[in-house]
Amino acid sequence: MARTTPITRYRNIGISAHIDAGKTTTTERILFYTGVNHKIGEVHDGAATMDWMAQEQERGITITSAATTAFWSGMAKQFEPHRVNIIDTPGHVDFTIEVERSMRVLDGAVMVYCAVGGVQPQSETVWRQANKYKVPRIAFVNKMDRMGANFLKVVSQIKSRLAANPVPIQLAIGAEEKFTGVVDLVKMKAINWNEADAGVTFEYEEIPADMQELAEEWHQNLVESAAEASEELMEKYLGGEELTEEEIKKALRQRVLNNEVILVTCGSAFKNKGVQAMLDAVIEYLPAPTDVTAINGILDDGKDTPAVRHSDDKEPFAALAFKIATDPFVGNLTFFRVYSGVVNSGDTVMNPVKSQRERLGRIVQMHANKREEIKEVRAGDIAAAIGLKDVTTGDTLCDPSNVIILERMEFPEPVISVAVEPKTKADQEKMGLALGRLAKEDPSFRVWTDEESGQTIIAGMGELHLDILVDRMKREFNVEANVGKPQVAYRETIRETVKDVEGKHAKQSGGRGQFGHVVIDMGPLEAGGPGYEFVNDIVGGSIPKEFIPAVDKGIQEQLKSGPLAGYPVVDIKVRLHYGSYHDVDSSELAFKLAASLAFKSAFGKAKPVLLEPVMKVEVETPEDYMGDVIGDLNRRRGMIEGMEDTSTGKTVRAQVPLSEMFGYATDLRSQTQGRASYSMEFLKYAEAPNNVAQAVIEARGK
């Protein structure tokens, strides 16, 4: 089958924003104008096409980034049809992982800002992620019809808060209830959308007289910005020559692709104004797959030889799985982005990350939650495969005869864990199945069984993250669960060496007795090593060879639950150097018990301590809140390591015990009016101060 749309006419874009900037409404309008959607779904009615999970409709926030394909030929049908693949991304901080993964597979992004709220905290986080993946972007200032809307104020915030270089290509005509349309600063015309057909048609008009001067000023700003694209244009501009519309657009496009400027558009998605022109800007200024740098990877040749794949049908097939979703009708849907080559349904592909081949059964293109089955996908396409068994997020799919592993995505370690148990015994198996499914969909979510308590533990990126997962278990798998309090994983160890500690197990009660006797030395090992070492220094057969493994085993069993508070014991070395035995009464069991008695006695004498997990915490905050943030980290027993300037404020680096970090997201939000963001990851185990250790030991003893 030949390609229906040339790859130069593809646009793979994300629509990204803070929680209430009106991103879902904006996406809905895009689907409407591109002719995909015939009835406009309103978020307030819970009927928006993109927000297809039940919780999203209730909470009115977007959780899963749905990928949708649409076609656009321009507001005035001025282009050939372009294929626009849209990935809708969530705006809540606990779902940052979703934003991160969609940024990884996009070529460009539209940042939606609220004309009233401006650049809000999550906008800053999303901005940093887009910077990390060098995603070219344009901005859409939405909600121009709302009380307090101010387009130019938002433009200046993009400059001050995001340290970006915003270049408006439009101005708003009026604001609040007087918002009627926009001025196109390239054409220097006013655009007026017809309300009778929900803005499908429009007229170009003269710029209102009272805006003439302002429009001229911003037109000059735009032309100057375009002229900076090349020396040639700059000379022409400085020589007083007019730049043509085509020259301006070409130059601005070049600067967007180089991440030098952010073009800013505006409108009110709700009032059907502006989205149409923003779509034109997507086509005119955002990159096609052929405009972005080739994707890097490594060959599967044992030497990790670097390799690249270009956006070209002729190159070997290579794709990246960026999302797994469970569909009630077809099971697993694996969303993937094709970087190079062509693949047909029915083909076998290689997953080099898992060293497995899989057959691509059916391939579907998604329109929000509707599906269209297709026979093949080519470079630049975003589609979903049905029935891939072992693919997880971040895996590569490629041609089995040209194996390449594309750059993997990085997923943070979960930072909060809670115990969950099904409300009824009958749900136990269903819960295991549900948690397995959810963990496969979401790489930032982990599940394991606590060996001591037998409880199922789930861990994730934040409290809302875990709430939603528990909620999904109930809705999608009909499993109701009780959820425990967040927990910290402590450890126990010793600080001193003790010698010649005895352990004797002797029992005589008629018939055959039991006898085992060991003498050990015990001392600390360096952290980060094997965690446990056993040395057999028995000479002269004071303990027969066959009982030595039983001594080792007896000690290892004690390591699982330490004498202090029942937490695992780490970093100790045990030397067995003497003992005695009885020809008849000695047995493996007797020596195992003798060893455990010796261990307990030695552990108590060797200055036992409790270790707590310490996290590496980075807080990015506007400078005004710096003092509050540092004071708060100090109160949490944090050790400030350093500070540095960033484009949006300051970054504070600190080491903070995990037990002090519960509820931090909420506290940080209220301290900084939601303008700071933080990340944390596990750093090391360190000795807990006496008062903390005592409190933990007492709580465990209850």
Swiss-Prot record:
Role this protein plays: Catalyzes the GTP-dependent ribosomal translocation step during translation elongation. During this step, the ribosome changes from the pre-translocational (PRE) to the post-translocational (POST) state as the newly formed A-site-bound peptidyl-tRNA and P-site-bound deacylated tRNA move to the P and E sites, respectively. Catalyzes the coordinated movement of the two tRNA molecules, the mRNA and conformational changes in the ribosome.
Name recorded for this polypeptide: Elongation factor G
InterPro entries: EFG_II (IPR041095), EFG_III (IPR009022), EFG_III/V (IPR035647), EFG_IV (IPR047872), EFG_V (IPR035649), EFG_V-like (IPR000640), EFTu-like_2 (IPR004161), G_TR_CS (IPR031157)
Domain spans labelled tr-type G: 8-290
Cell compartment(s), UniProt: Cytoplasm
Entry-linked HAMAP family: EF_G_EF_2_B (MF_00054_B)
An example Gene Ontology molecular-function term: guanosine tetraphosphate binding
Keywords: Cytoplasm, Elongation factor, GTP-binding, Nucleotide-binding, Protein biosynthesis
Entry GO CC: cytoplasm
Pfam families for this protein: EFG_C, EFG_III, EFG_IV, GTP_EFTU, GTP_EFTU_D2
Presence of keyword Protein biosynthesis: yes
Name of encoding gene: fusA
Organism whose genome encodes this protein: Erwinia tasmaniensis (strain DSM 17950 / CFBP 7177 / CIP 109463 / NCPPB 4357 / Et1/99)
GO terms, biological process: ribosome disassembly
Gene3D superfamilies documented for this protein: 3.30.230.10, 3.30.70.240, Elongation Factor G (Translational Gtpase), domain 3, P-loop containing nucleotide triphosphate hydrolases, Translation factors
Annotated family: Belongs to the TRAFAC class translation factor GTPase superfamily. Classic translation factor GTPase family. EF-G/EF-2 subfamily.
Residue sites binding GTP per the record: 17-24, 88-92, 142-145
